[in-house]
Regions:
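Extracytoplasmic
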Residues: 40-74, 95, 181-182, 261-267
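Hydrophobic core of transmembrane alpha-helices in multi-pass small-molecule transporters
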Residues: 50, 118, 130-146, 253, ...
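Extracytoplasmic gate region of multi-pass secondary transporters
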Residues: 59-63, 243-299
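Interfacial helix-cap and linker-helix signal at transmembrane-aqueous boundaries
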Residues: 66-67, 98-99, 180-192, 270-271, ...
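Conserved MFS/SLC helix-loop-helix module at the cytosolic interface between two early adjacent transmembrane helices
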Residues: 90-129, 302
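Structural signature of the two symmetry-related core transmembrane helices
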Residues: 106-120, 309-324
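Cytoplasmic helix-loop-helix junction between adjacent transmembrane helices
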Residues: 135-172
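Helix-loop-helix hairpin linking two adjacent transmembrane segments in secondary transporters
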Residues: 169-220
Length: 431
């Protein structure tokens, strides 16, 4: 069994002798980690993540519309979202492998045009299953998937000292998309209909994502001999790389099954309570705007204490906020609880990427980060469908919230065990 250890990463810069990454192409001079170019690259990556993230949230906004359009139940109306998320997960892993081999530019040049095509095709569908398939293949797998896991992994290669905050910033694009797109879609659907809105999104994705993607042509040159050294890393973890990866995958699924209940169903939930879908869209935007703040804050915390402790903190706060949904369903209280939920859970998913970078070599970043982050997407997909199915069985969302809390407790147990295992190994080495 190979023991996973924390170690120095990258190759030394010649002029300073400081360990780090060197970024270059044959026609360009090397760029050290945390350079001004890396920060400009981060800005472009954030824009791509925000635009591409529309593929994750569009099906949430039109959930009540799909229910009425195709005559399906709440569980059936949740399936297009689930299909998009499953496609998103599969595509993330495949595109992550492609990025490891060819750089992020090739996946991005695939993503923009096909995401736009996916929205146009979805607008032209005439049956429920056509819509589900388009959501899964074009919107999820070939479109939006590139703008999450693979893009986060690419950004992690360009930073060392500020990796935590950099990863948090680009991962915030997913939540910025959730804060921006639902309100835009809700308004445009009310004016022109969902099909015309989808066509407009498709055109917008193509004309913005392609030029932004071209800004990321330059590749990072990395030395993949060892993992990154985390701020809190001071010893080995006595588990094989396969075991570490597997544990993180299960934990990511569990946390996001819990996370999906409010995110996927808050609009439908507000409709059931009589507040209307527009109020639900506002709550979703508030939740995800608070999530952006959470992601940035957790990135700063992780830069000081490491990914695992920050991950446990966020998971515990998410569980507590889910409990708050049970006794409170008034309009004002739902706004407050949704804001608390966003602040609690926003930083969880990016910390999985940081933990992966703490344990695995940079040359494996695209594949391994994408695998864990896409596992979180699978959790969102399962949880979104599961909550709808529980609603169909019980007629309310109370049992769905309890289901989310149970999955959240499983996540806390797994990550706590992983941290305790590392601490025990460190104590053994000290003796």
């Amino acid at each position: 069994m190979r023991v996973v250890r924390f170690g120095a990463e990258g190759i030394a810069t010649r002029h300073q002798g400081i360990p780090g990454l060197i970024m270059q192409t044959p026609s360009q001079s090397p760029q050290p980690a945390d350079s001004s170019y890396a920060w400009w690259r981060l800005v472009a990556s954030l824009a791509l993540s925000t635009i591409g993230g529309v593929g994750l949230w569009s099906a949430v906004v039109i959930l009540p519309t799909i229910e009425a359009e195709f005559g399906v139940g709440r569980g059936g109306a949740s399936l297009p979202y689930t299909a998009a998320m499953i496609g998103f997960a599969i595509g993330g892993v495949l595109m992550g492998k492609l990025a490891d081999r060819a750089g992020i530019i090739l996946p991005l040049m695939i993503s923009g045009p096909l995401l736009g095509l996916g929205f146009v095709l979805a607008a032209l569908t005439t049956s429920y299953w056509q819509f589900v398939i388009v959501q899964a293949v074009f919107v999820g797998m070939l479109g939006s998937s590139v703008t999450f896991g693979p893009l986060v992994a690419d950004v992690s290669l360009w930073f060392r000292r500020w990796r935590g905050i950099a990863v948090a910033i680009v991962a915030s694009g997913n939540y910025l998309a959730g804060a921006i797109w639902p309100s835009i879609l809700e308004r445009t659907i009310a004016v022109v209909g969902w099909r015309e809105s989808y066509m407009g999104i498709g055109v917008f994705c193509v004309v913005t994502m392609v030029p932004l993607g071209l800004l990321l042509r330059r590749r990072a040159v990395v030395d993949g001999t060892g993992p990154s050294k985390a701020p809190s890393a001071s010893g080995p973890l006595p588990l094989s790389p396969t075991h570490v990866q597997g544990v993180l995958v299960v934990a990511a699924i569990a946390c996001c099954v819990a996370m999906s209940m409010p995110q996927v169903h808050i609009i439908a939930y507000c409709g059931d309570l009589g507040y209307g879908p527009a109020i639900g869209a506002q709550m979703l935007s508030l939740m995800l705007a608070m999530g952006v703040i959470s992601r940035l804050g957790s990135g700063l915390i992780a830069d000081h204490i490491g990914g695992l402790p920050t991950l446990i903190l966020g998971s515990a706060l998410q569980c507590l906020s889910l409990v708050f949904y049970l006794p409170f369903n008034g309009l004002t209280s739902l706004y407050v609880v949704s804001a608390i939920f966003g602040l609690a859970q926003g930083g969880i998913v990016p910390n999985y990427a940081l933990v992966v970078r703490e344990y695995f070599p940079a040359r494996e970043a695209g594949t391994r980060v994408s695998l864990v982050l896409m596992s979180s997407v699978v959790g969102m997909a399962i949880g979104g469908w599961m909550s709808g199915a529980i609603y169909d069985l019980t007629g309310s969302y109370e049992a769905a919230f309890l289901n989310g809390i149970a999955w959240n407790l499983l996540n806390i147990a797994i990550v706590s065990w992983l941290l305790a295992t590392r601490l025990r190994a460190r104590e053994s080495l000290a003796q």
